[in-house]
Amino acid sequence: MRLGKDGKVELIKRVPLFSKLSKKGLEEVAHIADELDLPKGKVMAVEGDRGREFFVLLEGEADVTKGDRSINTMKEGDFFGEIALVTKMPRTASVTATTPVRVLVITERDFGALIKHSDEVGRGVAEALAERIAPELPV
């Protein structure tokens, strides 16, 4: 069953990158999020590649690997790629569907256009990123 706008908003607001957004900002992000059905075995992220999309797992499971070692199993509600979407840093792990999956996807292009169009989304994402990296900065 496909998510409606409210379902997308509920998932997106759990993502730390979007935690500072108002309901309107969350709705703007939900508007650019696409639902995709992907087959078992589909590689959604490759370690070392530059991330160009952000994923929320809606149904199914995916294996997270670093090198040839499995480090985690992702399930419904888990997400990945949000930092790569903004920072353009390489992926730190690979993610492969171990069952057929349904995902919510936000592409770099759509997200970039939204940030240019929406001051609130741009500010909210910048604030959330600053809070995330501040503890790692030397004092």
Regions found by a protein language model. Give the residues of each.
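Cytosolic regulatory regions built on CNB/CRP/Popeye-like sensor folds
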Residues: M1-V139
